[in-house]
Regions:
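A generic structural signal for residues embedded in beta-strands
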Residues: 36, 84-85, 227
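Short, Lys/Arg- and Gly-enriched loop/turn segments at beta-strand edges
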Residues: 42-51, 89-99, 237
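FNR/FR-type flavoprotein reductase catalytic core
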Residues: 71-216
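Local cysteine-cluster metal-coordination motifs and their immediate loop/turn environment
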Residues: 112, 190, 213-242, 270-275
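Short Fe-S-cluster ligation motifs
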Residues: 235-239, 243-280
Length: 280
């Protein structure tokens, strides 16, 4: 059992939790993930390590409420326990040797991008961060990114905060200003990553993306997280989650990601209705 030490609501649909998990924290690195079960009968869901504190023995997770399991997780409070918390899993993000990097995060993907930007900053790299959201109410981790970035661009679709536009608009602007990046790291919605990669390919900039498809066992056995990368089948849980963005078949990944969306929406609505009845 893993105790929740801190809970913070970042926006109406995104929550941060610090979880007591010393063995996981001891080995965690940016880019890796954990798989948890809220209770004994719960489903297994993957969540990327948003931060870690080896001395305190804690792992920070940030999740968006999108289905019944994340709804159930969000109902837990400080002092409550998560039944299973397995990790760290996956291959950590490559950060060594990079001198100038653009880190691009979209929505809740910023939770994955932040620890990478933080490590790059700590290694002495020049970090240009671009974070994008639909509107000001959905902005998360702005202060955290500001503390580890030499340049920070905040974009919103409607212009209610930061600059109006897409993350690709900001990235193109920085490239056209003459910034030569060793690498671009893009993490967020599949469509966003697809178009970031399309842009960087035109300029010949190496680009890494973090792929977070459906996962079940986290060992590559189930095949649920399979992707096509460079014409070959890869598994996000053991081969990733980071991949060369110019080799990822995004159209296939987008199609696969929508397979269970209707079912997830239905379960989310059922859970919400059940919770309302319990309250009543």
């Amino acid at each position: 059992m893993y105790k929740i030490l801190r809970k913070k609501v970042l926006n109406p649909t995104v929550t941060l939790m610090d979880v007591e998990a010393p063995l996981v924290a001891k080995k965690a690195e940016p880019g890796q993930f954990i798989i948890l079960r809220v209770d004994e009968n719960g489903e297994r869901i993957p969540l990327t390590v948003a931060d870690f504190d080896r001395e305190a023995g804690t792992i920070t997770i940030i999740f968006q409420i999108v289905g019944s399991t994340t709804e159930k997780l969000n109902r837990l409070e400080e002092g409550d326990y998560i039944h299973d918390f397995v990790g760290p899993l996956g291959v950590s993000s490559h950060t060594e040797g990079l001198k100038k990097v653009a880190v691009v995060g979209g929505g809740v993907g910023c939770a994955i991008a932040y620890p990478i930007a933080k490590k790059l900053h700590n290694l002495g790299a020049e970090v240009h961060s671009i974070i994008g959201f639909r509107n000001k109410d959905l902005v998360i981790l702005e202060d955290e990114f500001n503390s580890v970035s030499d340049v920070l661009e905040v974009m919103t679709d409607d212009g209610s905060h930061g600059t109006k536009g897409l993350v690709t608009n900001a990235l193109l602007g920085l490239i056209e200003e003459g910034h030569n990046y060793d690498e671009v790291i893009a993490i967020g919605p599949l469509v966003m990553m697809k178009f970031v990669c399309k842009l960087t390919k035109e300029y010949g900039i190496p680009t890494v993306v973090s792929m977070n498809p459906i996962m079940i066992d986290g060992t590559g056995m189930c095949g649920g997280c399979r992707l096509t990368v460079g014409g070959q089948t890869k598994f996000a849980c053991v081969d990733g989650p980071d991949f060369d963005g110019h080799l990822v078949d995004f159209d296939e990944a987008i199609e696969r990601s929508s397979m269970y969306r209707g079912f997830e929406r239905q379960k989310h609505e059922e859970t919400c209705n059940l919770f309302k009845k319990e309250v009543e």
